[in-house]
Swiss-Prot record:
PANTHER family: AMINOTRANSFERASE CLASS III (PTHR11986), PUTRESCINE AMINOTRANSFERASE (PTHR11986:SF112). It catalyses: an alkane-alpha,omega-diamine + 2-oxoglutarate = an omega-aminoaldehyde + L-glutamate; putrescine + 2-oxoglutarate = 1-pyrroline + L-glutamate + H2O; cadaverine + 2-oxoglutarate = 5-aminopentanal + L-glutamate. The gene is patA. Pyridoxal 5'-phosphate binds at residues 150-151, 274, 332. It holds the Pfam family Aminotran_3. It comes from Cronobacter sakazakii (strain ATCC BAA-894). Its EC number is 2.6.1.82, 2.6.1.29. The keyword Transit peptide does not apply. This is Putrescine aminotransferase.
Amino acid sequence: MNRLPNSASALACTAHALNLIEKRTLTHEEMKALNREVHDYFEQHVNPGFLEYRKSVTAGGDYGAVEWQAGGLNTLVDTQGQEFLDCLGGFGIFNVGHRNPVVVSAVENQLAKQPLHSQELLDPLRAMLAKTLAALTPGKLKYSFFCNSGTESVEAAIKLAKAYQSPRGKFTFVAASGAFHGKSLGALSATAKAAFRKPFMPLLPGFRHVPFGNIDALRELLGECKKTGDDVAAVILEPIQGEGGVILPPSGYLPAVRKLCDEYGALLIFDEVQTGMGRTGKMFACEHENVQPDILCLAKALGGGVMPIGATVATEEVFSVLFDNPFLHTTTFGGNPLACAAALATIHVLLEENLPAQAEQKGDMLLDGFRQLAREYPHLVQEARGRGMLMAIEFVDNETGYRFASEMFRQRVLVAGTLNNAKTIRIEPPLTLTIEQCEQVLTAARRALETLSTAQSTTAVATES
């Protein structure tokens, strides 16, 4: 039997990869070879731009550090055996830590039975996860659509709002400046960063943006849309803007948005892809002011850092537009048994260990420390802000933020900038971070700022002379 063209090359690649997957440790020579190999394959087959983006995690100036395995709940180990304290959290996916044993065990047990669903028989874990989210989420949220990512959950929310509001003659969506809701076409239409939007114009029609946190601007736009017949179908917001730079709205803003939506018959969509699952000190950030959305978007930490999963949770009134034709919006892998097992275990850990409360306590400790550093280094730091374990340090310019991330990396602490605000470095560790590790982060931040300050002073003296 003839093999397929190019099969020998592909087989060699898969055999090599499977051999690596089986290995627990690497020799020094194997590490060096793997680092070079991964660098080359990123450059030649993934995207060379990622190598530049990951400059802050570069060893020796010629290749990016290559991830190998989790260390403990809150650490990562690279191929050279160096252990890093994770304060980036995979952009917010590791709320219950790396390889949390409860989550891993649930996924392994389900894997031993059936990894994916048949699409014909009823899958029990999807039913149980939907019931769990109905019990856990605020207000009248009752039905869940499951997908694989935050962007997909936002896409589902937009389509759900469209299906509900189109018969009512409402087609306009309102999002906020600085917003990040994803990069697929619908989600990107709500996202507010020109660099992400411009190459794909025109996006979906009917999306408007108002300043985040400005209730008067929202009121004015809703009124204007009403007068011109462009009635608003939905307002979509992050309760705290993550990629925008960890921007908190003024107190009372979210309740006022809820009131305006009710007044104008608009749905309220909360994108809690990054703020949900205990990250801010409550299970969901909207609970800080007891605001209940019509649609809630979840993902990232929902899978416990083990499986990708997203969810779009809605009230029965809104979700009922899918009852007559449940195939109106579906996805092959959404709600698969492995992902649902991970999500159920993640929620169990969050509740059993009261991790949202821990996030509030340890977040307060870290934020107090960062604010003290901001006062000590005002020539470098503009502001430290956040809520719970979602924090940011905003520097005076992009270069200073980049150099801070590089210095933290040298001290084996992982941090990175936000997508919409390059001079803002996010601090988004697992909620399982210990008090001792919190102190380690603050010590590393102080040393990094001391290094930057000394370098700045040296440069200034050299310039004067």
